[in-house]
Amino acid sequence: MAATRRLTRELSDLVEAKMSTLRNIESSDESLLMWTGLLVPEKAPYNKGAFRIEINFPPQYPFMPPKILFKTKIYHPNVDEKGEVCLPIISTDNWKPTTRTEQVLQALVAIVHNPEPEHPLRSDLAEEFVREHKKFMKTAEEFTKKNAEKRPE
């Protein structure tokens, strides 16, 4: 299966790359089509914790995009209450089979660091981000401290 070969190589490349904002990326014991990892943001307000993520690859990968899910709650306009992310690079309209998982994860880090209120999954948070930015940042930081995992050393 082409997906297996490619995912094996991509996972190996990601582990070797040692991105400071992504830790413990690994595939599940049951399937190479499901990865988990820890997102460790560097910018406020999310730099007070770490967020468990899950990446699910369809059997048709790389011809179909993966799906990313936050397993840790996050106060973010581009992530809904179920943990689903609005990430243009993995939308069916924008997906290209040449896109690598590392690029997807870099886009995820970028959207966490710089929310895009113009593409919200939570319009209430997008509005707060735009209209009451200081309040949003304070609430997001408190939410992160309360709900996020401890940051790795």
Swiss-Prot record:
Location of the active site: C86
Gene Ontology terms, MF aspect: ATP binding; ubiquitin conjugating enzyme activity; ubiquitin-protein transferase activity
Top EC class of this enzyme: transferase
PROSITE patterns: UBC_1, UBC_2
Superkingdom, natural source: Eukaryota
Signal peptide: none
A GO term from the CC aspect: nucleus
UniProtKB keywords: ATP-binding, Nucleotide-binding, Transferase, Ubl conjugation pathway
Name this polypeptide is given: Ubiquitin-conjugating enzyme E2-18 kDa
